[in-house]
């Protein structure tokens, strides 16, 4: 089934349904389509027969379009979903049926305004990641995908770029439901050897891959752009069909033609880096002066660039007609890639590795990429709040990040300097020492108080992209501990937000919290995330607690993983019931059985004990 919405407005929309019917030649076949609105109410129905003159065994049938008055449009804020029900009868008997969800929305791309959804300008504020889900690895669980999306959305993200393969069918369907825009990607390089793990050469089966991919995903309203490849214009062997010698342009045009055969409603792109035109890279002496975008970027319908956001204005001077999307941005430069962009004219940004993932670790004992804003457990680092200050400017924000100089990293990765400024919220340090920290804010100014004493007031420097919304406080006196409070104020001096961190005392208890205690389905696949935090007598997290935690569980669930959030540990996630806590925390992931029942979780650590009782529910 292929569902399109050729005309969309707040007052009226048309919905067109196309189906493929096989094995109909000797029968009187009728096809009926019924549309239901998000509440399940029938809002339209149409019937059609088969074409009279064709010898095709599998025939595409376009049913007459239906017009809906006052449609409920799909958007990030209100992801309204309709259902299209198709029933096929042969000689009066029902022989097949199919139901598909879809959304009513319009997409527009332009070099003048970037991207519009339903006629409204939207700047994509995205994440580009590999598809693993923390301790679960590449296993697909709906709850884990939804949890990740909701956490990103709560920090102002509205888009995810799939990298560098189609994600699960569940991923896009959950994005439909949650209201996350998706840039759907086919593959990495167009190579028969490198970056391709298939049993057959990529250039032999590309047509099958594209057809299967587009047909599977084309009804998803969350998907706004097809990405056909990534960082391939640097070697001819990565850029498609041998002998074309045009850095992928011919291959792209062929791929794009097949994409349009199966979906004419979306544009296509290819993410470009690290070469300029002619495959000139940083290793060539003319690189810094030769600001000509790669040939393929000038041929794609949307020009996607990874990194080098400071060169985009020069690219647009060379080719003003480019519709420009920053498909990867370095997290190490924080908000600079975001503020380097002309947000009125460009499509958006996707930070590479906003969430920690496995692989590309650079060094032992690290297991993956951790130059990120979110831990692989989805716990936010302080830098995530900096991103939130820009992604959600309407919400006053201030957040403290204490500098951990020993944890800082910086490496050259694929011609990009990447790394991380290690920050935390711990205020347990050596008496008499000094600590530097940042306050991240979108307010006019911040006052810092240490144990009630003012360290001064600093204004937010909004004139420089590399300093905006981040205020540095050097050598703040720790004394004997206590509290640090950041107070954010507007231009009039009125307090608009504050954040407080405190020195924790001795560990006395375990705080055990289930994330969705009343929503745990007994379907054999639903997950329950349980977060364990070691606290002192005042309920403050004890950051320097690293004792082992032991778990006992019984009831209608099974233990999937123990995850302390440490990206450097060599401890297992699975098949264990005890693990060292990290920064006083542990995440427990449980999976329901198929029968409803009670679940009891008993936890102990160095004399601290706690019990959590839950129930799974059969729908």
Predicted features by range, described:
Residues 149-152, 159-407, 411-415, 426:
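Substrate-binding/catalytic cleft of secreted carbohydrate-active enzymes
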Residues 1-164, 174, 178-182, 219, ...:
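Secreted/periplasmic carbohydrate-active enzymes, especially glycoside hydrolases
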């Amino acid at each position: 089934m292929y569902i399109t919405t050729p005309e969309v407005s707040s007052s009226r929309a048309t919905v067109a349904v196309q189906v493929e019917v096989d094995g109909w030649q000797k029968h009187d076949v009728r096809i009926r389509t019924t549309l239901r609105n998000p509440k399940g109410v029938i809002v339209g129905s149409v019937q059609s027969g088969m074409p009279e003159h064709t010898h095709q065994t599998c025939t595409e049938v376009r049913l007459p379009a239906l017009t809906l008055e006052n449609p409920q449009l799909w958007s990030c804020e209100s992801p309204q979903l309709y259902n299209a029900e198709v029933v096929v009868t042969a000689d009066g008997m029902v022989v097949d049926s199919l139901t598909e969800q879809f959304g009513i929305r319009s997409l527009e791309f332009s070099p003048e305004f970037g991207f519009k959804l339903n006629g409204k300008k939207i700047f994509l504020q995205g994440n580009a990641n590999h598809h693993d889900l923390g301790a679960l690895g590449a296993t697909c669980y709906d709850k884990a995908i939804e949890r990740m999306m909701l956490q990103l959305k709560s920090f102002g993200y509205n888009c995810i770029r799939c990298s560098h393969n189609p994600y699960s069918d569940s991923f896009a369907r959950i994005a439909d439901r949650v209201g996350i825009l998706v840039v759907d990607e086919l593959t990495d390089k167009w190579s028969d050897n490198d970056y391709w793990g298939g049993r057959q050469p990529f250039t032999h089966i590309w047509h099958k891959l594209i057809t299967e991919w587009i047909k599977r995903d084309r009804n998803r309203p969350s998907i706004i752009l097809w990405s056909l490849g990534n960082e391939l214009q640097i070697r001819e062997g990565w850029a498609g069909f041998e002998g074309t010698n045009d850095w992928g342009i011919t291959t792209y045009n062929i791929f794009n033609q097949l994409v349009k055969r199966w979906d004419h409603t979306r544009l296509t792109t290819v993410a470009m880096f690290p070469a300029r035109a002619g495959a000139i890279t940083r290793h060539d002496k003319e690189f810094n002066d030769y600001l000509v975008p790669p040939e393929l970027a000038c041929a794609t319908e949307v020009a996607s660039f990874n990194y080098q956001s400071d060169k985009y204005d020069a690219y647009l001077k060379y080719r003003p007609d480019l519709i420009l999307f920053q498909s990867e941005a370095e997290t190490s430069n924080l908000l600079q890639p975001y503020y380097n962009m002309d947000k009125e004219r460009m499509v958006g940004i996707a930070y590479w590795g906003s969430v920690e993932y496995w692989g590309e670790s650079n060094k032992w004992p690290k297991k993956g990429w951790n130059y990120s804003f979110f831990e692989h457990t989805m716990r936010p680092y302080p830098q995530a709040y900096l991103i939130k200050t820009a992604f959600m400017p309407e919400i006053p924000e201030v957040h403290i990040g204490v500098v951990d100089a020993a944890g800082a990293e910086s490496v050259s990765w694929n011609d990009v300097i990447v790394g991380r400024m290690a920050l935390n919220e711990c205020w347990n340090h050596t008496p008499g020492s000094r600590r530097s920290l940042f306050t991240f804010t979108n307010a006019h100014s911040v006052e810092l108080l240490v144990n009630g004493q003012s360290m001064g007031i600093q204004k937010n420097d909004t004139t420089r992209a590399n300093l905006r919304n981040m205020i540095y406080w050097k050598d703040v006196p720790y004394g004997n501990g206590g509290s640090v409070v950041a107070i954010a104020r507007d231009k009039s001096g009125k307090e608009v937000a504050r954040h407080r961190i405190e020195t924790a005392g001795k560990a006395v208890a375990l705080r055990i919290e289930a994330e969705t205690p009343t929503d745990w389905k007994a379907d054999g696949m639903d997950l329950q995330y349980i977060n364990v935090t070691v606290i002192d007598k005042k309920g403050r997290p004890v950051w320097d607690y690293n004792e082992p935690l032991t778990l006992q569980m019984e009831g209608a669930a099974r233990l999937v993983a123990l995850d302390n959030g440490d990206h450097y540990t060599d401890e297992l996630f699975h098949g264990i019931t005890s693990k060292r806590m990290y920064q006083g925390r542990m995440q427990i992931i449980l999976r329901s059985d198929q029968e409803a029942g009670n679940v009891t979780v008993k936890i102990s650590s160095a004399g601290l004990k706690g019990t959590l009782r839950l129930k799974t529910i059969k729908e």
